[in-house]
Amino acid sequence: MSATTTPLPKAVIFDAYGTLFDVHSVVAAAEQMFPGHGDALSQLWRQKQIEYTQLRTLADPAGARYQPFWNITLDALRYAARKLGLDLDMPGEKRLMDEYACLSAYPDTVPVLRRLREMRPGGERIGLAILSNGNPQMLDIAVKSAGMTGLFDRVLSVDAVRAYKPAPAAYALGPLAFGATARDIVFVSSNGWDAAGAGWFGYTTFWINRAGAPAEELGVIPHGTGGGMADLLDFIENLAPPDKSPGRSRHSPGG
């Protein structure tokens, strides 16, 4: 884990897809449907999904080109299947979209979220939220199916501003929800571009580099990095004053 000096967080906000939820947990179903192509379909599906969100916001920041994330996810799936020459019929679409609606959580996610809920640095609980490109209905289903009900104070969707990350209007939802400055909130994402966008906006950022990818060449460095949620917990504990919550010892930054 790496870290730089940051203030005590008033809240921790998580990206959802790829950070809490494993977007590639659809591979098994995709591979069963298209043997030998499941991984390629999942990878291209995700790539086009992100591209389409960004293109729609870039084309018209006012939101005229906005489509809900569910629609974009379906469009991206259809493109990926055509690109790979796969015969994806309507029942197949439904099966894969149903899989996407109920993505698996990464194994390290729920235990660390519960630990964060228990923390009382300085006697106050740290607020927890999701800030996601997902539309509200998608997020509600995903949170429930992943066993995360009750772990978040807020589940924030960019649908409220009709602009996808990394648009500033999307990131502004976090400080507004908690009545805090962006600097006083830790924004957590596994997507390097998302961590960079949040950093530009002013958040304290933590990049969960699950894939072991190189840092983005964007001139902005996350305040902390790590390979999983346990590293995030260490990062938060080193920002916070000692509390009386049970469970973990403290470590020095960079340990």
Q: How would you label these PLM feature ranges?
A:
Residues 34-38, 83-88, 121-123, 147-151, ...:
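Short helix-capping segments at alpha-helix termini
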Residues 39, 52-95:
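A metal-dependent, Asp-based hydrolase signature
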Residues 90-102, 109-146, 156-158:
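Substrate-recognition element of Asp-dependent hydrolases with the DxDx(T/V) motif
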Residues 2-9, 131-255:
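Asp-based, Mg2+/Mn2+-dependent phosphohydrolase catalytic module
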Residues 26, 41, 92, 148-151:
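Hydrophobic side chains within well-formed alpha-helices
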Residues 57-65, 117-127, 243-244:
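Intrinsically disordered, low-complexity coil segments
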Residues 2-50:
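Active-site neighborhood of HAD-like aspartate-dependent phosphohydrolases
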Residues 27, 42, 46, 70, ...:
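An amphipathic alpha-helix signature
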